[in-house]
């Protein structure tokens, strides 16, 4: 999470960004939202586009928990088949069984992304930038991509009308 300050409320001139890499897939209630972000400035600007409805409904499995219901990367493969949703949206895949033991989370079976870089500073209390980068390749099917990376950077400004700059940079190598 990166922010321009700590004032709260709808009238506050603070910008806040939440950047998520989401390394492990714990299945069940887990969403396919690795590499997503949410932005807030005088109100909610970006993030999830779905209202979490009833568990187990088509909306729950085909939208709310899927990449398409967030602002993740959709990489469409016309030959892809889904065993989880009624439609193929190009989002991340679910291939992990339910987690039964905590130790199993340490295996590659449950890895959907890896943080490959993060930094903020130089002042840890009032940083000039916040950066995170992740390898999202494990979250997509092997026959679709050989590399998927997303990097995000947040930089506060001194401008009250535009209190921050937020960059999202993607690298996708398809097969």
Regions found by a protein language model. Give the residues of each.
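Catalytic and substrate-binding regions of extracellular carbohydrate-active enzymes
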Residues: 1-175
């Amino acid at each position: 999470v990166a922010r321009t300050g700590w004032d709260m409320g709808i009238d506050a001139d603070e910008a806040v960004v939440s950047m998520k890499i989401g390394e492990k897939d714990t299945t069940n209630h887990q969403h396919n939202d690795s590499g997503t972000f949410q932005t807030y400035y005088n109100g909610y600007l970006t993030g999830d586009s779905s209202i979490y409805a009833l568990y187990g409904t088509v909306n729950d499995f085909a939208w709310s928990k899927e990449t398409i219901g967030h602002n993740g990367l959709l990489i469409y493969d016309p030959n892809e088949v889904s065993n989880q949703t009624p439609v193929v949206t190009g989002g991340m895949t679910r291939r992990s069984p339910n987690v039964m033991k905590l130790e199993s989370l340490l295996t590659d079976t449950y890895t959907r992304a890896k943080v490959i870089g993060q930094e903020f500073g130089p002042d840890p209390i009032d940083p000039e930038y916040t950066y995170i980068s992740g390898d999202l390749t494990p979250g997509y099917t092997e026959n679709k991509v050989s590399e998927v990376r997303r990097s995000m950077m947040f930089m506060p400004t001194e401008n009250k009308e535009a209190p921050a700059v937020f960059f999202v940079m993607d690298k996708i190598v398809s097969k």
